UniProtKB/Swiss-Prot annotation:
Nucleotidyltransferase involved in the post-translational modification of proteins. It can catalyze the addition of adenosine monophosphate (AMP) or uridine monophosphate (UMP) to a protein, resulting in modifications known as AMPylation and UMPylation. It catalyses: L-seryl-[protein] + ATP = 3-O-(5'-adenylyl)-L-seryl-[protein] + diphosphate; L-threonyl-[protein] + ATP = 3-O-(5'-adenylyl)-L-threonyl-[protein] + diphosphate; L-tyrosyl-[protein] + ATP = O-(5'-adenylyl)-L-tyrosyl-[protein] + diphosphate; L-histidyl-[protein] + UTP = N(tele)-(5'-uridylyl)-L-histidyl-[protein] + diphosphate. This is Protein nucleotidyltransferase YdiU. It comes from Salmonella agona (strain SL483). The keyword Transport does not apply. Its cofactor is Mg(2+); Mn(2+). It comes from the Bacteria.
Amino acid sequence: MTLSFTARWRDELPATYTALLPTPLKNARLIWYNDELAQQLAIPASLFDATNGAGVWGGETLLPGMSPVAQVYSGHQFGVWAGQLGDGRGILLGEQLLADGSTLDWHLKGAGLTPYSRMGDGRAVLRSTIRESLASEAMHYLGIPTTRALSIVASDTPVQRETQETGAMLMRLAQSHMRFGHFEHFYYRREPEKVQQLADFAIHHYWPQWQDVPEKYALWFEEVAARTGRLIAEWQTVGFSHGVMNTDNMSILGLTIDYGPFGFLDDYDPGFIGNHSDHQGRYRFDNQPSVALWNLQRLAQTLTPFIEIDALNRALDRYQDALLTHYGQRMRQKLGFFTEQKDDNALLNELFSLMAREGSDYTRTFRMLSHTEQQSASSPLRDTFIDRAAFDAWFDRYRARLRTEAVDDALRQQQMQRVNPAVVLRNWLAQRAIDAAEQGDMAELHRLHEVLRQPFTDRDDDYASRPPEWGKRLEVSCSS
């Protein structure tokens, strides 16, 4: 089967990009590719043949129909207007046309200098490409909207960051790379007609059902807000901290995008800061819902030339509704509740308080809770708490709440185990794979990818364990 590519972004939004070719790396070689995703997309196996060099995965060749561009956008970074940004090291190679008529962006990260590189070198490093590949695939298999990773190429090109690292490229796939920052760019350039063109493009290609509706723009922004709310709810329930929620890292389609200084909670710490550059804690775990709303308000401002203020405010209210509704549903599922009762939030908050006091492991606590039996006053979870009396008091109330529902243990446990993962991408697991890969051993990278494809399967190895001493509080930054 021949892959078919289109260039809708390039053809329809000429003011939003610069056309250019990738700059290949020295002695580039394919070290990992997503065989499952490649099969789904009918990508010929021959494209991954190492005897052909790095090929399209390393920017050495293009596939028929590809028309590479680097996109321009702007944004607020850490709450401050940063002006023009753009694809400083990434190039949108083309949009794959799928059988159902939809498209999928092929975006090559680390593809070399662009007009938007600013003071950067246009490169990505092996460390960051491995982290993004693992994180995006982990999120996908957790059921959270995200970009996807298709391939990683390593090289002999040295790249200077805090230390000298190895240059690499990541092929990232997404339904769209349209960001809040695209709209901000033209709004602050006082080109409202181009802001409206972006909205028209989004509606035409992703919400065509509203194309001929008079209030299409208000309906569209309402859905953007709702998708963002549901996404943030998913992050909070699984314990994911993005680390750098700048407006240019926010997806119009409600996808998790731009994995940098992210982290999944180990110990439950609502004030967890994943990014060691975030000195004020703006993007700490428990502030993500507020930041997402702030970012939506910045997007709403760009839409004021063609959406009434009342409609924008209604959409922002929709964000709050979607966030709280989805979060409530997810947390009830994590606790094994099939109905909503007035004391559920209090019960959840009591558990969170206990976990925060004791430094309980977020993922393991909920996974162990999913094995609870209504009639048993004992729980393996009890042994993880120092204050047994406090846990016992909470657990008695929890079991009493379970008994208010006519659901047997087997069904409830099954539901809980579908939403409480046994495995998440802890930073130490990613670091172990990175350390091996930097020594030329890709086995752990491949093994970890396989493990992350089955996050809801119980394991008795260290992929499901708490981090070792060296793996606690690993510092990560925006440098990639």
